[in-house]
Design a protein with these regions (language model features):
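Small-residue-rich transmembrane alpha-helices
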Residues: 12, 16-19, 308-370
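Structured, solvent-exposed hinge/loop segments at the ends of secondary-structure elements
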Residues: 14, 18-139, 148-155, 204, ...
C-alpha cells in the first residue's frame, strides 16, 4: 500500500503540473482560425510597442489604415473596462466588461450556453455563465435587464460558457459599442486574415511611420502581431492598473515547471521500483520454480508487467481522486485556475497506464530473468 500511495502522490503532482502546462501552452486554441488571427500594435521609432487598434477618431489625413488591405477577411474592435459595475435590483456588482460588436464572437467563438451570441441592438448584452450564476443563482437570465455603469438599461440576450482552452481575455460582460456614441477609451483590434497571407509582408507594406495628432505628431506605425504568440510575448506593452482584462503568461515559468515535473516523475519512479524490487526479493524462489517448470522470457515479463499495470492503475485512480479533492484549493487558495480538458486528461491517463508499467518493469525483469533457477530457488524466501 505504501508503494501505491507513494506513486499516487507523485503522479498527482505530475498530472497537476502537466495539466497546467498544457493549459498555458494552448491559450487561445479554441479560436478556430488561430493561425490567421492577429492583433494590431502601435510601434514608435524607438522600438516601443503598445497594443492598439485602427481607430482614427480625428480623421487624420496622415492616417493609413492597414486593415483596408484586401487580405483582411474580418476584423473587430473592442474596449476593455477592467473595473466596471452593473446594478441588478438594488445590488451593485463589480464586473469586467468588453465593449465590442458581433464580429468579436465570430473571431473568438466562445461556446453559446443559451440565447444568441450576437449584439443586434445597442441595448443587447451577453454575459458569461459565471456571471449568470453570480447574479441570478440558477434562474434563466435571458430577457432580464440590468443597469449598466453608464445608466443605460441593457437586456441580456445571450449567455456564453468557458472556452475549451484558456483565453487571453478575462471578462464577465459583453456590451454593444453602439450603446454610447463615444467611450473615451483606447480600443484594440482583432483581425482575421485570408489563409496563406504573410503578415510580415503586410508589416513591410505598412512600415512607413505616420505623424498623427492623437499621438501628438510622434512618428508611429501600426503592425500586425499573431494572436497565438501574444500570451507569452514580452515586447508589446499594455498600459493598465494591474487589473487588466488581458491575461499574460511567462514561458520561463513553464520551462521551470517542466523540469520540476521530470524530477518529480523520476523520484516517484525510483521510489516505486526500489520498493517493488524489495518485494520481488521475497519472491525470487517463485520465479526460480516457474523457470524450472518451463516459464520463458515472455512469461516472466508478462507477469511483472501485469503486476505493475495493476499497481499503476490503482495509483492512477488514487491520484485522480487527490486531484479532484485539491482542485478547489488550487483555484481559490493558490489562485491557479484549472480548466477541465477531458480529452487531454484521458490521453495522459492512457499514456501513464501504458508507459509507467513498461518503465517500472524493465529493471526487475532484467534482474530476475537472467538469474539461473538454482540461484533463485536457493534465495531466502
Amino acid at each position: 500500500f505504501i508503494n501505491i500511495l507513494g506513486l499516487a502522490l507523485s503522479l498527482a503532482c505530475v498530472l497537476i503540473i502537466l495539466r497546467y502546462i498544457h493549459q498555458e501552452v494552448t491559450v487561445n486554441h479554441f479560436c478556430k482560425d488561430l493561425e490567421n488571427t492577429y492583433l494590431l500594435y502601435c510601434e514608435y521609432e524607438d522600438g516601443t510597442r503598445t497594443i492598439s487598434s485602427n481607430e482614427d477618431r480625428n480623421n487624420d489625413p496622415n492616417f493609413i489604415d492597414p486593415l483596408k488591405d484586401p487580405s483582411v477577411l474580418k476584423s473587430t474592435r473592442w474596449i476593455n473596462f477592467s473595473e466596471d459595475r452593473i446594478t441588478v435590483g438594488k445590488q451593485i456588482y463589480n464586473v469586467k466588461t468588453v465593449v465590442t460588436d458581433s464580429a468579436f464572437l465570430q473571431i473568438l467563438p466562445y461556446p453559446s450556453v443559451s440565447g444568441i451570441s450576437s449584439l443586434k441592438s445597442p441595448n443587447d448584452a451577453i454575459i458569461t455563465r459565471r456571471l449568470a450564476e453570480r447574479l441570478f443563482k440558477g434562474d434563466n437570465p435571458i430577457g432580464k435587464t440590468i443597469t449598466y455603469s453608464t445608466g443605460d438599461i441593457i437586456t441580456i440576450t445571450g449567455v456564453i460558457g468557458e472556452p475549451p482552452t484558456k483565453s487571453f481575455l478575462d471578462f464577465d460582460l459583453i456590451v454593444s459599442e453602439q450603446l454610447q456614441h463615444s467611450w473615451s477609451r483606447s480600443s484594440y483590434s482583432l483581425i482575421q486574415l485570408m489563409p496563406g497571407t504573410d503578415f510580415k509582408k503586410l508589416n513591410v507594406k505598412n512600415e512607413k511611420f505616420m505623424k498623427l495628432r492623437c499621438y501628438m505628431d510622434t512618428p508611429t506605425r501600426l503592425q500586425f502581431f499573431p494572436l497565438k504568440d501574444f500570451y507569452f510575448d514580452k515586447t508589446i506593452r499594455i498600459y493598465d492598473n494591474g487589473k487588466s482584462n488581458f491575461q499574460r503568461g511567462n514561458y520561463n515559468n513553464i520551462l521551470v515547471l517542466a523540469v520540476v515535473t521530470i524530477a518529480l516523475l523520476i523520484i516517484g519512479l525510483f521510489n516505486f521500483i526500489n520498493i517493488y524490487t524489495v518485494m520481488m526479493l521475497k519472491r525470487a524462489r517463485e520465479f526460480g520454480v516457474k523457470k524450472v517448470y518451463g516459464a520463458g522470457t515472455k512469461d516472466v515479463f508478462a507477469q511483472i508487467f501485469t503486476e505493475n499495470f495493476i499497481l499503476t492503475g490503482m495509483a492512477l485512480c488514487i491520484s485522480w481522486c487527490i486531484i479532484e479533492i485539491t482542485g478547489g484549493m488550487m483555484e481559490h487558495v493558490l489562485r491557479i485556475p484549472q480548466i477541465s480538458n477531458t480529452e487531454f486528461s484521458a490521453i495522459l491517463s492512457v499514456g501513464v497506464l501504458i508507459l509507467l508499467p513498461l518503465l517500472t518493469s524493465i529493471y526487475p525483469f532484467i534482474r530476475y530473468n537472467y538469474v539461473s533457477p538454482s540461484v533463485s530457488i536457493r534465495s531466502v524466501n
